[in-house]
Design a protein with these regions (language model features):
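Transmembrane beta-barrel domains of bacterial outer-membrane proteins
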Residues: 4-122, 126, 221-230, 263
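Outer-membrane beta-barrel strand-turn architecture
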Residues: 18, 55-61, 98-104, 135-139, ...
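Transmembrane beta-barrel strands of outer-membrane/channel proteins
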Residues: 24-32, 67-73, 108-114, 146-150, ...
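Solvent-exposed loop/turn segments connecting transmembrane beta-strands
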Residues: 40-45, 84-86, 117-125, 149-158, ...
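Membrane-embedded beta-strand positions in outer-membrane beta-barrel channels/transporters
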Residues: 46-52, 89-95, 128-132, 143, ...
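Repeated loop/turn-to-beta-strand initiation elements of outer-membrane beta-barrel proteins
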Residues: 59-65, 102-108, 140-145, 171-174, ...
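Outer-membrane beta-barrel translocator/channel fold
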Residues: 71-82, 179-253, 258-265, 272-274
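Outer-membrane beta-barrel "beta-signal"
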Residues: 162-165, 171, 233-241, 268-282
Length: 282
């Protein structure tokens, strides 16, 4: 005689994790030659390279611990005016984030490392900190972003950031968020077009600066905040699984060597730039 059928309640399936866990990125940006605003400093150009790798560890829900490493470097060529010929930084990433479909909505990040010119010492150590939170102003359409950053080698040491994200449609959105605002158009799943502005900067402690033309730049272990203000166009291609290829060009409006503690700032005229970059996520 057949037994009575029994049923066991099955636990509901765990929602699939829609976020990438391994994140690689590489960028190189070349700014062509332009004159310094003080003619006695001559002219110069810059080459920027950046590599980073991060891994996200799921904590619970959509909260993650992200750990990684990054190397940044600027190389400068042109007139021998005593300004640094390179700036470098090697640092870690320690971040706690709330992530939805690979977009962090809340986060705090520490970047402990050495920020230097040529030689590494204890004086080069810094722990920049940045934190942000985003929240909806109009559901699925308009979002506000509020951020704050701190670093020993920047002026001011505490600086605000943030702005507005406005989603006009599935294909067009405005990310008016400082320091990298952009208007983004995505005609399909494979292509992305950006009109962008950006402030890219790095604060370091330099070696001795000795200038043959500007003795106010004769400085010992000075703190330098180097900045590039850019505006341009960028194209991204994501038709290859896990890979995004990026090419861009535009104008570096100004490059600024700011020895803010010595009250010396040396700026350049505008010059064109070109960029190639790649991102891998899986």
């Amino acid at each position: 005689m057949a037994g009575t059928a029994t049923y066991e309640a099955q636990p509901s399936p765990t929602p699939a994790d829609q976020n990438s866990h391994d994140l690689f990125s590489y960028e190189t940006t070349y700014t062509f030659d332009s004159d310094f605003q003080e003619s006695k400093l001559g002219h110069g150009n810059s080459l920027y390279n950046d590599f980073s790798y991060d891994h996200r560890f799921l904590i619970t829900g959509k909260w993650y611990l992200r750990l990684g490493v990054e190397y940044e470097r600027y190389d400068f060529d042109g007139t021998d005016n005593g300004l640094p010929d390179k700036l470098q930084a090697v640092y870690g990433h320690i971040a706690f984030e709330y992530v939805v479909k690979d977009f962090p909505g809340i986060g705090i990040e520490l970047d402990p490392g050495v920020y230097y010119q040529e030689h590494i010492s204890g004086d080069n150590f810094d722990i920049p900190i940045k934190a942000f939170v985003s929240f909806p102003l109009k559901k699925d359409k308009i979002f506000a972003v509020v951020g704050l950053g701190w670093s020993l080698f920047q002026d001011p040491p505490v600086a605000p950031g943030g702005g507005i994200i406005w989603v006009f449609s599935d294909k067009l959105r405005l990310q008016a968020v400082f320091p990298k605002p952009a208007l983004i158009y995505e005609p399909n799943d494979d292509w992305q077009l950006k009109l962008l502005g950006e402030l890219n900067y790095l604060g370091v402690r330099t070696d001795d600066v000795v200038s043959p033309t500007e003795h106010k730049l004769d400085l010992h272990n000075a703190v330098l905040q180097y900045s590039e203000y850019r505006a341009g166009v960028q194209i991204g291609y994501t038709g290859i699984k896990h890979l995004k290829l990026i090419a861009g060009a535009g104008c570096t409006i100004e490059r600024d060597f700011d020895f803010f503690r010595a009250h010396q700032s040396k700026r350049t005229d505008p010059a064109p730039y070109v960029r190639v970059a790649a991102e891998v996520k899986f």
